[in-house]
Amino acid sequence: MSSRADGAVTTVGTVRVIVTGGGTGGHVYPALTTVNALREALAEQGRELEVVWVGARGKLEERVAGQAGIEFLPVATGKLRRAKNPLGMLTWTNIKDLARVPWGALQSVAIVRKRKPDVVVGFGGYVAVPVSVAAWLCRRPLVIHEQTVRLGLANRLLARMAKSTTVSSPSTLDLLPGRARKRAEVVGNPIRAELFGGDPGRAIAALALTGFDRNLPTVYVTGGAQGARQINNLVTDDLPWLLKQANVIHQCGATEITRVRETADQLSPDLKQHYHLAEFIGTELPDVFALADLVIARSGAGTISELAALGKPAILIPLASAAGSEQAFNARYLDENGAAKALLGEVTPADLRAAIATLLDTPAARTQMASNARTLGKPAAAQSLAALILRTAQ
């Protein structure tokens, strides 16, 4: 045992970290991946990680932390629902939520004072605000991470307080305040290590894709874990044409499975054997990615980071209502760098068909897109971020 300068008694070699952030998978899973990378890095040094996750009760972060065996502490928080007209934000729901923030800040200060972390790491989302402010008030080093190309509102506020701001894309640096920019580092967006171990043969076996024609390319269609009606509609409207060009694995989401299956049931047997419909792709995802020659997806921060790191050619259809149109910014960033094709605005089945045809008919175009994606991808992002956090904690 040893005593730190602040009076906290700690096991020799133990690093104390408070992780905060949540609300969506885009914040939660990079945080979890980073915690795992921290544990691995410290284990190699014969040291240990003492970590607590501070988030909102009943949200995704509480469930994920519990499943990973990470201690979880809830604090009150509120969400600011944005509107094009600033007056539109003066709603009772916004006012009620924002009134919870001071209480959340007091809770967070109490947690930081009691735990005396070596470093606090924020991954965005509104719950990260009170905890990060508490770190600043208690003079604990704060590291924040931005997953999106366009700087999120929470991190825009916190960047001035952070000892280090880490971002996923060089394009984000110019959006930071001047002083924060000098303390910023591009590390990429941490993605799950298991995604890099995919095997096409395992996907065929696990999903029983015995009818797939291996002479055809494979297209993976996904709207994320919940599915996306817009993408489902675009694909099913032209499904017979698509199945003449490719095998298709289609993750449509639980709420859409019945409707999409009705469309699939109308396919001729020779086309239907090239089509695999699922409401969710779980543990098979690394293998599905390995099998896919082309991915059709949304453009959330996690998705584009995975596609880039894996070097997967993609057609991106952003969620128009994403906060601050961040998905459109993400998609445009990859498109401008030749790493994906972005379909923006009102997308029609004809638009999607043209984009698919160009990439399926021209293997060289897919190869070049994959190469461009890998150039943007940072597969060691979790390790880079973990190393920075440990340097900050010293």
Where are these regions (language model features)?
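Glycosyltransferases and closely related glycan-assembly transferases
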Residues: 107-120, 127-143, 156-164
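Acidic donor-binding loop of glycosyltransferase active sites
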Residues: 117-119, 289-303
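N-terminal subdomain of nucleotide-sugar transferases
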Residues: 2-58
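Conserved nucleotide-sugar phosphate-binding/catalytic loop shared by glycosyltransferases and other
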Residues: 17-22, 43, 47-100, 187-189, ...
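Donor-nucleotide binding loops and adjacent catalytic segments primarily
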Residues: 48, 64, 83, 200-295, ...
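A short, well-ordered alpha-helix in the C-terminal region of glycosyltransferases
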Residues: 365-379
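C-terminal alpha-helical cap of glycosyltransferases
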Residues: 378-394
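Active-site-proximal region of nucleotide-activated glycan assembly enzymes
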Residues: 19, 136-201
